[in-house]
From Swiss-Prot:
Its main location: nucleus. The lineage of its organism: Eukaryota, Metazoa, Chordata, Craniata, Vertebrata. It comes from the Eukaryota. Belongs to the Antp homeobox family. It is found in: Nucleus. Residues 145-204 bind DNA. It holds the Pfam family Homeodomain. Transmembrane segments: none annotated. Residues 218-227 have a biased composition (Acidic residues). GO terms for biological process: anterior/posterior pattern specification; regulation of transcription by RNA polymerase II. This is Homeobox protein Hox-B7a. A motif (Antp-type hexapeptide) lies at residues 134-139. It comes from Danio rerio (Zebrafish). Sequence-specific transcription factor which is part of a developmental regulatory system that provides cells with specific positional identities on the anterior-posterior axis.
Amino acid sequence: MSSLYYANALFSKYQVASSAFSTGVFPEQTSCAFSCSSQRASGYGSASTGAPVSSSSSVSLPSMYTNGTSLSSHTQGMYPTAYELGAVSLNMHSSLFDHPNLPMVSAGDLCKAQSSGKEEQRGYHQNNENNLRIYPWMRSTGADRKRGRQTYSRYQTLELEKEFHFNRYLSRRRRIEIAHALCLTERQIKIWFQNRRMKWKKENKSTDRCSPAADQIGGDEEEEDDE
């Protein structure tokens, strides 16, 4: 009996206390807790259903994303130009080596081109040599030079024949005078007189009454004059 009495008394006290707390001892705290719990529940519900939390957040977030997309598109517009330039430069470098329309050149063609170039150079040098005038004083007098037959004009031959008719042997002074008068060298005058004497001897071999001693004396005099 005593235990039941104490239990009923405690139970009645607890009921009085709970009614006191529920009537308004801490009314704001219970409402705040309820509002927070309701906000959390609504937040969880929106997260589970995928609905936007608030209108302001729903407006601000897409605008931020749209700005991000515009920035990304702007950067994409900047970089492809650089990549395109790189591609163009690469194509330019590759075009230097890709020539499908050009014919293949062989070693024989190169040899022919070189030979034709050499022939053109030879022709050019020959034309230049033909255009040059070579005077007698420009010709070399060395022993290795090929000696051609000297041709005399009609006037030169006539004057030399006249001189030979009077003198078959010339002194050096007279030889120099004739060379200046006929525009010939002293050597040419000497050679002409030697050849003319040999011809005269052959023509007048039978009728010539001159002794060989006289010819020898004349030759010695000419050699002395040369010295």
